Amino acid sequence: MKPISASIVRALPVGAYLNVADNSGAKVVKLIAVKGYKGRKRRLAKAGIADLVIVSVRDGKPDMIGQIFKAVVVRMKKEWRRRDGTRIKFEDNAVALLKDDYGTPKGTIIKTPIAKEVAERWPDLAKIARIIV
């Protein structure tokens, strides 16, 4: 995975409910695992912006509810600092669903804004995003 140019805070623990930013059919998902997280015994794994996570669909199309998908965190409420000194935060926590580990998006468009750090690490998501902040 490509490194990103920001000091990211991991603020989304396992069990967090997240909105879905794309048009894949899911509306709300639950975070169940963070890929590549190296933590301590008995400590919940946490995710930050542009992290690859595993989610379970909780609300959306009836045929998708309960299914497990890989996703990327594209927005986070907790503010983080960029290398130029600016701080950025969004009004909700959101993910974009993926078809595979390589970053192929399940949806065809992301109408809401995504972070620049996501576009750096996941170029296929940047292609379908309308707004990159």
From Swiss-Prot:
Disulfide bonds: none annotated. It holds the Pfam family Ribosomal_L14. InterPro entries: Ribosomal_uL14, Ribosomal_uL14_arc, Ribosomal_uL14_sf. The keyword rRNA-binding applies. Keywords: Ribonucleoprotein, Ribosomal protein, RNA-binding, rRNA-binding. The keyword Ribosomal protein applies. It comes from the Archaea. GO terms for molecular function: large ribosomal subunit rRNA binding; structural constituent of ribosome. One of its GO terms (biological process) is translation. GO terms for cellular component: cytosolic large ribosomal subunit. Part of the 50S ribosomal subunit. Forms a cluster with proteins L3 and L24e, part of which may contact the 16S rRNA in 2 intersubunit bridges. Belongs to the universal ribosomal protein uL14 family. NCBIfam families: PRK08571.1, uL14_arch. Binds to 23S rRNA. Forms part of two intersubunit bridges in the 70S ribosome. This is Large ribosomal subunit protein uL14.
